[in-house]
Amino acid sequence: MKVIVLGAGIVGTASAWFLQKAGHEVIVLERQPGAAQETSFANGGQISVSHAEPWANPSAPLKLLKWLGREDAPLLFRLRPEWLQWRWGMEFLRQCTPGNTAYNIRQIIAIAEYSRQTLQSVRAETNIEYDCETRGILHFYTDQKEFQQSLPAANLMRDLGCPRQTINTNEVIRIEPALAPIRHKIVGGDFTTTDESGDVYKFTTGLASQCAEAGVTFRFNTFVTRLISEGTGASARIVGAEIIDEHGKHQTIRGDSVVVAMGSFSTHLLKPLGINLMIYPGKGYSATYPVIDNALAPRVSMTDDGHKLVISRLGDRLRVAGTCEINGYSRALNPVRCEAITRRTQELFPDACDYNQAQYWAGLRPLTPSNIPYIGKTKYSNLFLNTGHGTLGWTMGCGSGRAIAEIVSGRQPELDFAFTGMARTSVTRAMISIPVHVKNS
């Protein structure tokens, strides 16, 4: 079967990898000149099952009010005259109840743990070098109230099999001595030994190279303008994709199935087909600094929970990423938010890096209100979704690619997860956590 994959980020490339391993002919269409040029380019580097608590949680509404008007707020809403943003925001608030948060954590952990194990298998098979660190992930807190608020989610994660252990200040410093300059401010933390970190760009480009060697066709600088459908009702299907190629010519690429892995841009492509996904872009920032003193720079990947920043050592670089700006599709850098990242990093590790050589970047995370991605089927028999992974695309990427390859091949993935458009085998709930609004054909 010929499968067209739309998008060559970590999710699309992993989908292509597993589809070719399942015996399919695969062609990947990507508008950028290479793989991992957008959201997968310079993220925080964490493969973090322990980061399963969604942004939408019981403490989020009050935090949003507290952050209102702050240009450097960890989560910044810029309200626009745009119905999708308002509808997304209302659904986000609806997901902030304790019951919805607990359900969403279960789903996120299921796909994240499946993906972590899948990544380990791919790494063993391919030997891709991507500055991998398997030292775990450390969350630390500098606010006692926020630390106490984190405990129920951490306890639930432990109950679900994620070994996220609550620790005291002394243990935080023992695990990562580089935090010693702020020891007096740390009130506690938690540590997950099985989490990892690494450079998603290096991994994705390495995997894309091995995909190409295995027979996958990549067409870069290729814009998909629309998907062509035929039939109605149960017989509706996609017969191809209209593109503008690297020479500016219009073409039609035909295939037997299509996998949409275009992140935040999936929404616009699918809307004319009557598939309205609840995905909105969340602009995330990162800063990358050259390390100048190995003894003072951290080795363990960390999350600074109070500032919503993740910190990963990538060889001789330190990557610090985070914050979220709900403000449409602009990737323009806000100097205030960039400076806030560097200011906090200097507070933590004052002499570890050359902060004058900061490389700033912003990418659009495809956010669903619940943080649960769309992985599965649509009303079109041969159109599949692998999108909406939010802040956890690197964490969920390999597992999502493996799962969608199973679904395209007509098989049920071996994990208990709310796959889109598919019946659940175990966990059920009266409420759908991510609404998919579909118009009748």
Which stretches of residues belong to each language-model region?
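C-terminal catalytic lobe of FAD-dependent flavoproteins
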Residues: 164, 305-306, 330-332, 346-441
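Predominantly flavin-linked oxidoreductase catalytic cores and closely associated redox partners
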Residues: 151, 155-184, 191-280
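N-terminal Rossmann-like FAD-binding beta1-loop-alpha1 element of flavoenzymes
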Residues: 2-28
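Rossmann-like flavin
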Residues: 86-210
